[in-house]
């Protein structure tokens, strides 16, 4: 059993949500709650925080992702639907499966986007820690503007890849 929470929040708020959920699940009878933070040591680009829950009735998992982490993961799943599940393991030596040069470029682009997302989210987190009523210096205002623009560019690129994958799936149905 499991659930996924996709939230339009900063990294700090993502962690706060996880901490609140840990407390809530413990109050509700979880005998064990383990946190697995996949934001820095991603697996094939995937980033999130997972809660592994143990209850007397069994196990459950809750994934908490930011909006960008979620968008990336959904696009990557679409790529895996088209190119094959093995794309998750291309970094491993004995990975079975091959990609065309074009497919390989797209998968590598997704991995690069994941790294950019990580950097942009860290920057967004830092910029958002400044209280709006504080007198912002020019550099901070500039950083906030650039961070917003980069986030928007990443969203646009993910949207374009999503549309490309939709068209590929459509053409395969014909």
For every predicted segment, state its role.
Residues 1-20:
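Charged, compositionally biased non-catalytic regions
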Residues 7, 53-55, 64-66:
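Flexible glycine-/small-residue-rich
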Residues 18-54, 59:
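Short Gly/Thr-rich strand-loop-strand
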Residues 58-174:
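An acidic, glycine-/histidine-flanked metal-binding catalytic module
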């Amino acid at each position: 059993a499991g659930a996924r929470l996709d939230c339009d929040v900063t990294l700090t708020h993502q962690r706060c949500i996880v901490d609140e959920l840990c407390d809530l699940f413990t109050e509700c009878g979880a005998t064990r709650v383990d946190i697995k933070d996949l934001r820095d040591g991603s697996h094939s680009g995937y980033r999130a925080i997972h809660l592994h829950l143990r209850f007397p009735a069994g196990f459950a998992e809750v994934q908490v992702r930011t909006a960008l982490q979620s968008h990336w993961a959904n696009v990557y799943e679409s790529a895996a639907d088209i190119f094959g599940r093995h794309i998750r393991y291309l970094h491993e030596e004995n990975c079975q499966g091959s990609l065309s040069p074009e497919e390989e470029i797209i998968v590598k682009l997704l991995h690069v986007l994941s790294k950019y997302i990580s950097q942009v989210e860290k920057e967004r987190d830092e910029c958002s820690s400044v209280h709006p009523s504080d007198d912002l210096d020019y550099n901070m205002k500039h950083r906030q503007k650039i961070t917003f623009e980069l986030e928007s560019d990443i969203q646009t690129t993910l949207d374009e890849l999503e549309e490309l994958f939709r068209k590929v799936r459509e053409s395969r149905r014909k």
